[in-house]
């Protein structure tokens, strides 16, 4: 069994972490993030690191241990480096562009799809078939990418649709006559 929770999370210079009640707040050069703390584990901030320990040896407490440590690590990475995902659009006439606070997608429907860009997320379209999503919250960046991809998932015959950069689409052969 993995014991990722044993490793303390180092807090780099320029980042401050504070525990107030049941909330851990992390402030860094890119912004501020916070999570609510689980009751199954205890947290300690000491000399430039945050350590997470289970309060008892139950299966539930041990399962929360590694997850909560990873969530703390994601907060620190988010406020220092940020997260980004890239989507590739494949298909004749499929394109995307940013117009103000909306992402306009042309995906072969009879109408254009307007996707409202949420707060804390930046979307850029370097070209018409590439969408770059970035932000400091890993969960929110992934959620926005999944919502955009949901409008036209890649199909296995021609590969048309929206896919993550680097994603492999399993291709099928068409019917034979």
Swiss-Prot record:
Any one Gene Ontology cellular component term annotated for this protein? cytosolic large ribosomal subunit
As given in the record, the signal peptide range reads none
- Residue runs in coiled coils: none
Give the GO biological process terms.
cytoplasmic translation
- Keyword annotations for this protein? Ribonucleoprotein, Ribosomal protein, RNA-binding, rRNA-binding
UniProt cross-references to InterPro entries, sorted A to Z: Ribosomal_uL6-like (IPR000702), Ribosomal_uL6-like_a/b-dom_sf (IPR036789), Ribosomal_uL6_a/b-dom (IPR020040), Ribosomal_uL6_bac-type (IPR019906), Ribosomal_uL6_CS (IPR002358)
Query: Cross-referenced Pfam families, in alphabetical order?
Result: Ribosomal_L6
Question: Whom does it interact with, and what assembly results?
Answer: Part of the 50S ribosomal subunit.
What does this gene product do?
This protein binds to the 23S rRNA, and is important in its secondary structure. It is located near the subunit interface in the base of the L7/L12 stalk, and near the tRNA binding site of the peptidyltransferase center.
What is stated as this protein's family in its record? Belongs to the universal ribosomal protein uL6 family.
Full protein name: Large ribosomal subunit protein uL6
Which organism is the protein's source? Rhizorhabdus wittichii (strain DSM 6014 / CCUG 31198 / JCM 15750 / NBRC 105917 / EY 4224 / RW1) (Sphingomonas wittichii)
